[in-house]
Structure formats: structure tokens, C-alpha cells
Amino acid sequence: MKKIAIQGTLGSYHDIAAHKYFEGEEIELICCANFEDVFTSIRKDSQVIGMLAIENTIAGSLLHNNELLRQSGTQIIGEYKLRISHSFVCLPDENWEDLTEVNSHPIALMQCREFLNQHPQLKVVEGEDTARSAEIIKNENLKGHAAICSKAAAERYGMKVLQEGIETNKHNFTRFLVVADPWQVDELRQHHANATNKASIVL
């Protein structure tokens, strides 16, 4: 079973991308609070594979992740491009008129700016992760709180989906890189032998 370190919790877009990339394989996710911890997981255990967002069609290049990658000594073994579709979700027994606050990752909030502008009554609060925002609302039964996250996260944490596809730009894609310890690269690449070779340059 492959161990995959991701930023975020179960139901996050990193979770979705990891399961799509390793479809048909058994994987165990290591959920990390931040991207630094993804690389720390690889340093602690060379068998761990990392998956991290590197570029978004709306937000652009994630410069911090490029720098972490450059410093890490890991090698890129693959990539996955995921269509990002955000949902507006709340507790199962609540509706639009009950909501006063919306929580999500800053980039997700930015990608849904037009939707949020249509609902000025909602206080916008940044969180560490899209799926984690939904998880906290459900676990702590936070009345009046909504989250912006994936539909998969809503289903995982038992949240009600009030509206799907709330992102401003429907051509919203994130490119994820799959990285590994250099000593594991050859073996891992054999499992994806049909992948197209690419080069990434950080200036």
C-alpha cells in the first residue's frame, strides 16, 4: 500500500486528486496541516509519496510550493490536473436564511468572489482547508456557519449542499505534482511507464 502525504484533510481537493492519480491502487493518506509537513513526511520516511498543488488556472503559480519543492531534494514523478468545482454547504437542518458566516480556504473564497458578492450578509472567514472547514462546522455543530468545499467533502461530513458550481470561472483547474525521495523514483516510475516525460524549471 502506498503512503501519500497531502495538505488538507479527507475530502479535500488533494484527497480527490490523490485517489484519481492512484486509481486502482491501495493508498493510505497522511493528512498534513501545511505543505512543509508534506515534505517533512517524505524526509522522515522515504517510502512516503507527496502530492501538492503547484498551479491553478485562476490563482496562478503557487510560488511558495515551488520554493519548497526546490529546497526539498525530492523529484517529480507525475502530475494530475483536477477540475475544481466548489459547493456551498451547511448543517443538515439549516437553510439559507439561517446562515451568517462562510468559512473556507482563502483561494477557494477568492475563486467564489462573484457568488459571495451576491450574498453580502455572509461574514467571510478564512480557514486552513476547504474540507476541514466543513468538518469543523459539522463536528462542532456550528449553527449559522456555511463552508465552501467539494461535494465529496460535503458527503463525507454529512453536510447539506445548498448550491453547486459556485466558482466564478468554470474553467478552474489545479495542477498537482507527485513527488518522491530520489531513491524511490525509478521504482515508482515503472508503475506509470506510459506517462509523458516533462521538465519543470524554477527560476
Short names for language-model regions:
Residues 1-203:
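Domain-level signature for soluble enzymes in the chorismate/prephenate branch of the shikimate pathway
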